[in-house]
């Protein structure tokens, strides 16, 4: 347990479905179903699966933001952070005194930098906001931290005085990464962080995240549907299907010797530039569609 930074035990997320004249609950959607994961410190875990598999819901459950948009959602089980310097924190039973600590230790990078950055705020204030909320640092210390973070993500301190619309998509995602790192977190949840970017920019952002992960010994949960990207960045992979983790293991092992039929179908459906065997791969993509029905 000493190397475990985050433990997920029997996690379930249910969204009630209401119907009838009086809008009573008539059924539930089980978005996450009995998920168990032990996540080691300093690792990058790829969470993969098609749309609707529950991977983004899992990330939002860990960051504890589901009820902000779905107040009727039911989340039960255990999500335990082991910060090593303090007592363990169970996010589903969190104490008021632990909230700031947890928000500092666990941060999230969202999929769309165009909507995740406040267009009315200067970039420096966007990056500084987590420090304003979760720390008691002085104004000068915060400004120095912002300048340092901008440099770390490949931007410069002068750009702190600009607005998000003045940046490209790749630069915006660099700003989002800087914001996530502001409080020196132990765990970063990256929810499809490059899917909205051009392929050439994707590679730059992925390489940046890998460099930062190594430099700061970050634990990253990298949520994605692009298996090629996940293979490049992840040390371990969890494959989700219909809310369940159907396969979990070392990245190379999962790619070279997948055990679950769904994992095999996902891997076989990866686009390949070689025209030889195109029909066979087309058949595998059709099989994946049938698998999802």
Task: Tell where the protein language model's regions lie, with residue ranges.
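Short catalytic/signature loops enriched in Gly
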Residues: 2-4, 17-23, 88, 250-293
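Conserved ABC ATPase signature
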Residues: 163-167, 171
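A short, proline-enriched helix->beta-strand linker immediately N-terminal to the Walker B motif
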Residues: 182-186
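A short, surface-exposed alpha-helical micro-motif characterized by mixed small hydrophobic
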Residues: 230-232
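ABC ATPase NBD Q-loop/coupling interface
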Residues: 78-101
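Conserved ABC ATPase "signature" region
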Residues: 82-87, 140-158, 267-268
